[in-house]
Structures are given as structure tokens and as C-alpha cells.
């Protein structure tokens, strides 16, 4: 209880993350005593702490706001803002000093939840706030309508039913629920048994709480699509943050329609964004981009490992939009074309040093120093990443100078991406995602182009499409009628045809056919094995494949789950 007037600062060396706010603040009060020192009035005092998480937690507790996910209300933010005016928090990192504002402070407090949200590909309850426990009639109906839309995309497991007759909690009821739950969990001498009336009331309130779980199971179909879009988003100013409020505005209309469930418009999204925890969303997005940006400073092999780790957290939006896993890319291209492979022979674990697979003439031709590779319909950039690395190794081997630094590696890598790799995308966002995968946030030339209405052009205007591809390549290289060494990829399998029960028609055959018409040295693609039986517009394609004497290898997987989870049909890939 002693205060020393001459003191203007306290250096916190004792305690832990669990230090009580009262003890911490009592220590601070030692230096708050007004004083006149050498004729000058003490106007400011300081606390120095090398445990920033402890500081933030204590300040949040002192201001009486919750740092738990989904618990922070608008009023809490106002209270915290007023407290920070009285007691500013300044972070020192290296030579930089930054003052905390409310959003940044809450992001830091919730970082344990942020890591979990990122690791789970936004498939996590921590992403949402407790507004979902206060749904009224209109909002419940909105969720019921949303369920019908997202259910059509098959983007999630069987959705819980929203009981539109069971309204959510009012603010008062929500506080009552928290109070009763807290009382029921008390132990030891503080334990106070609930009365029968309180038990009954607790059960009633819990039933209303169930609607939150049902709503989350619906929002999941939207949420799992967000990380990939955040990863690829192109910002004019990289200091700009991606927030739940500006997220939709950063995605172009064509990409939004492609990546979001059919029927979930930007307007519908803006109606439901209030159910997301803004600090968790913003910090999770920041974390994804920070991981991708940090990879730019690594060696080529380390960067590939980091980028593919990020992709391993992304979820497949639905059965029609399958993101080819890095493992499958390695299986496919390793089995068919060879090159440098990042998995051991069983394709169960990654290797610290990529192994070389030699397929003789095929490998020598496809991964030559002057090779030209094309992917049609890139979604992630992982196919060109594999191809670029194998050509990169060829160039390093033939390099006239010693490759001894990350800068040397990047110089050769950028040359490979600029001269050897060409990519066609379906949307501007797919183009941005591919670019991010290949060169990160650095400035370097990438040969990518997106085609509006790509499937229609390939299906109905194949000759025009080929001319457009040739024009794109000649503009980038100055070479007309370029001969590609290989065309690779995993094309879209089907599109919805508007029929009953999510009826669809196959489209992968058009991508295989267009690749043949381009006449590269080699083609290697993944496709469903439904063409074996014909029908559904596949009869001509089946006849063409059966009579094609250039097919060298066909790998058949009766269990598609050996390659992709949540895909029911047989899959095969071929090289011709």
C-alpha cells in the first residue's frame, strides 16, 4: 500500500499470464501518486512489461469486458475505447512503437482462437459471435432460406434444422443464461445448488441456445470458402486490412459467383456478416496473409513447404469445386511425368529433400530448360508449382553461376515462372490465387490469363479458344504457334444443369478434347471414370478415347476417396 511520489515507472518482473488484475493494477497505482519533482509536476507514469499478453488481459479485465470469442459487444468496445484514452497501451517491436486501438487489442487477446480458426480452415465455432443466440422471427426465417440455398451446393454435412418457432435470447435472457450456467459450475465452498425453478429456467434457455449450433452449421458452407479468397485477394494498398465489412467488396462479381454457394449474393452475405466475430475474422485473415508473405523470404524448397502447408488448412467448398491436394498433385504428376516429388513412395509423408522420379523420355522432354507447360483452369496454382520446381532444378543444374543465396534462387525461379509456365484461369480470383502460389507478394512476371465463361468457350468455341490461347502466349513471349511440352491439370468435372435433385452434366471431356487439339507433346489430366460407360453426352468422348493409340498410361482408382475425400465416383488420370 506504500506509494513513492518520486517514482514515474514500474517494471513488471513478477507474475504470470494468470496474474489477477487487482494485483497488477495495485502495482501500477504505486507510480500514479501526483508529485512535484524538481519544480515540475508529474503528468505521466509508465508500466513496462515484457509479457504483452498479460498486460492486455489485465486491462480487458479491469475495463470489465470479455476477451472470449464472440462475447464482445458494441458497448464493450466503447467502454474499452474510453479506458484506452485514460490508460494508453504502446507496443514496442524492434525500433517501432505503436499505440493499441480497440480492434488491435481485441485481436491480440483473441489470438489463441485465431490460430485455431486458421488451422481449421474457418470451420470453427470461434469464428462466430453470440448474436446467433438472439435470433428473432425474421432472422430465423432468413437462416431457413439460407439453408435451402447452401444445401443445394452439398457444401456441408447434413444441416441441423433451425426451429423457426423457437426465437433466440433477448439481451436480458442471455445475461440470465450466463449467470445460471456460471452458478451451476461453481465448486467447493462457493458452490450454490440451483433451485428447481432455476434448473427449469436453465433448460428453457439452453433450448433457445441450440439455434446457434444450427445456424453455425449453415454458415459453415460460406465460411470455409473464405480462407482461399483471403489468401488470393489483391489489395492496392497492402497495409489495408481485410475485415468482415469490406470482405465482399474486395471480390469481383465473377469470382464471387464462382467461389460462393450459388444463390448467396453479396447482399445476402452483408445481411449475415453481423454473426461473425469481427476481430477473429480480421486477425485470421491477417494471419493467413502473413504466413504467405513470410514464405517469400525462404529458400525455394522451404517456401513450397510453407505454401503447401497453408493449402492443407483450406477446405473443399463442395463436390463440384475440388481443390486438388498437394499430395494428389504429386501422385498424379509423379506417376505420369516424373520430376522432383515432395512425397515418399507411398505418398503418405512429405520429404525434407524432394526425390527425383525418372520416366525417361517423358521426364527429359517435359522438364527441359526450354520446356513450355500449360495448365487449363488453375484453381490453386499447385500444378504449376510442381512443374516449375522440376524445371527450376534443371536450370540450377545447368546454371553458369553458383546458386548460393536466396536471391540467386529467386532469380532462377522467376525466370522459370516467366519463361516456362503458362496458366489459364476461370476467374480473376483464381488468377490471383495462382500468382500468389507461384511468386507470393513479390513483383515478378507471371503468365496467367482468365477467360470469362471458360467452359462455354471450350465446349462451343474450341477453335476460337485455341486462337485466344495462342494470342495470349505470343503476347507474353513473342512466339507464335508455340508448341507446349505438356498440358496438365484437374479440370472441373461437372456443372449443374438445373434439373431435379441437383442434377448435373459432365464437362471434363471438353477439357481433355481441347488439350488434344492444342497438340502438346504430352497431356496428363485427372478425370472421373464415368466415361468408361458412356451416356450423359460422353459417347463420342468414349469412342475417341478407345480409339486413341497415343495413350501411354492410365491409372484407375475405383475408390475415389484414395485421392479425394467426399467424392463418390471412380477417378483416373492418363498421359498421352
Language-model features: locations:
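Receiver (REC) domain switch-region micro-motif
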Residues: 1, 10, 373, 487, ...
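Signature of N6-adenine DNA methyltransferases within the class I
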Residues: 328, 381-385, 426, 431-432, ...
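Long, largely alpha-helical accessory region at the distal end of helicase-like NTP-driven motors
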Residues: 53-287
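Class I S-adenosyl-L-methionine
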Residues: 241-412, 422-437, 457-461
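Extended charged low-complexity segments that act as oligomerization/scaffolding linkers
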Residues: 41-66, 404-424, 430-433, 447-470, ...
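Conserved RecA-like P-loop NTPase helicase motor core
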Residues: 2-73
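Short, solvent-exposed loop/turn and secondary-structure capping segments
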Residues: 21-25, 59-60, 342-346, 385-388, ...
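Short secondary-structure boundary/capping segments
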Residues: 8-11, 27-31, 60-68, 390-392, ...
Amino acid at each position: 500500500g506504500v506509494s513513492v511520489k518520486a517514482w514515474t515507472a514500474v517494471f513488471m518482473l513478477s507474475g504470470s499470464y494468470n496474474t489477477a488484475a487487482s494485483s497488477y493494477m495495485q502495482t501500477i497505482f504505486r507510480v500514479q501518486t501526483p508529485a512535484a519533482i524538481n519544480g515540475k509536476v508529474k503528468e505521466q507514469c509508465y508500466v513496462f512489461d515484457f509479457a504483452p499478453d498479460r498486460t492486455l488481459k489485465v486491462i480487458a479485465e479491469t475495463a470489465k469486458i470479455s476477451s472470449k470469442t464472440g462475447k464482445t459487444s458494441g458497448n464493450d468496445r466503447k467502454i474499452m475505447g474510453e479506458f484506452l484514452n485514460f490508460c494508453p497501451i504502446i507496443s514496442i517491436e524492434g525500433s517501432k512503437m505503436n499505440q493499441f486501438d480497440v480492434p488491435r487489442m481485441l485481436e491480440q487477446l483473441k489470438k489463441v482462437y485465431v490460430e485455431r480458426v486458421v488451422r481449421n480452415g474457418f470451420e470453427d465455432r470461434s469464428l462466430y459471435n453470440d448474436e446467433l443466440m438472439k435470433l428473432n422471427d425474421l432472422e430465423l426465417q432468413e437462416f431457413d432460406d439460407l439453408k435451402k440455398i447452401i444445401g443445394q451446393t452439398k457444401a456441408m454435412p447434413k444441416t441441423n434444422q433451425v426451429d423457426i418457432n423457437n426465437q433466440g435470447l433477448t439481451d436480458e435472457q442471455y445475461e440470465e443464461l450466463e449467470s445460471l450456467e456460471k452458478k451451476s459450475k461453481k465448486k467447493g465452498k462457493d458452490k450454490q445448488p440451483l433451485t428447481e425453478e432455476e434448473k427449469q429456467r436453465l433448460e428453457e434457455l439452453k433450448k433457445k441456445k441450440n439455434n446457434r449450433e444450427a445456424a453455425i452449421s449453415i454458415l459453415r458452407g460460406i465460411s470455409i470458402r473464405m480462407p482461399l479468397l483471403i489468401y488470393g485477394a489483391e489489395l492496392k494498398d497492402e497495409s489495408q486490412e481485410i475485415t468482415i465489412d469490406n470482405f465482399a467488396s474486395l471480390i469481383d462479381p465473377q469470382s464471387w459467383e464462382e467461389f460462393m454457394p450459388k444463390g448467396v449474393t453479396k447482399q445476402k452475405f452483408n445481411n449475415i456478416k453481423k454473426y461473425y466475430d469481427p476481430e477473429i475474422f480480421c486477425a485470421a485473415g491477417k494471419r493467413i496473409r502473413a504466413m504467405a508473405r513470410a514464405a517469400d523470404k525462404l529458400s525455394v524448397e522451404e517456401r513450397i513447404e510453407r505454401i503447401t502447408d497453408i493449402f492443407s488448412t483450406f477446405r473443399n467448398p463442395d463436390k463440384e469445386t475440388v481443390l486438388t491436394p498437394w499430395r494428389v498433385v504429386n501422385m498424379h504428376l509423379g506417376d505420369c511425368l516424373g520430376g522432383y516429388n515432395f512425397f515418399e513412395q507411398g505418398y503418405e509423408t512429405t520429404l525434407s529433400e524432394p526425390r527425383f522420379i525418372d520416366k525417361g523420355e517423358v521426364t527429359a522432354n517435359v522438364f527441359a530448360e526450354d520446356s513450355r507447360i500449360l495448365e487449363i483452369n488453375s484453381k490453386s496454382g499447385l500444378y504449376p508449382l510442381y512443374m516449375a520446381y522440376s524445371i527450376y532444378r534443371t536450370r540450377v543444374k545447368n546454371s553458369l553461376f553458383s546458386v548460393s543465396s536466396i536471391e540467386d534462387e529467386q532469380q532462377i525461379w522467376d525466370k522459370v515462372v516467366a519463361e516456362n509456365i503458362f496458366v489459364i484461369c476461370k476467374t480473376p480470383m483464381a488468377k490471383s490465387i495462382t500468382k500468389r502460389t507461384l511468386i507470393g507478394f513479390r513483383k515478378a512476371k507471371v503468365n496467367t490469363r482468365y477467360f470469362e465463361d471458360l467452359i462455354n468457350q471450350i465446349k462451343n468455341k474450341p477453335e476460337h479458344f485455341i486462337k485466344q490461347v495462342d494470342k495470349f502466349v505470343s503476347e507474353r513471349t513473342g512466339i507464335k504457334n508455340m508448341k507446349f511440352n505438356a498440358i496438365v491439370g484437374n479440370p472441373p468435372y461437372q456443372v449443374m444443369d438445373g434439373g431435379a435433385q441437383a442434377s448435373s452434366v459432365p464437362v471434363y471431356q471438353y477439357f481433355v478434347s481441347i488439350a488434344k487439339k492444342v497438340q502438346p507433346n504430352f497431356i496428363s489430366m485427372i478425370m472421373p471414370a464415368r466415361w468408361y460407360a458412356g451416356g450423359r453426352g460422353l459417347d463420342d468422348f468414349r469412342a475417341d478415347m478407345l480409339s486413341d493409340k497415343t495413350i501411354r498410361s492410365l491409372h484407375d482408382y475405383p475408390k475415389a476417396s484414395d485421392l479425394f475425400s467426399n467424392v463418390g465416383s471412380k477417378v483416373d488420370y492418363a498421359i498421352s
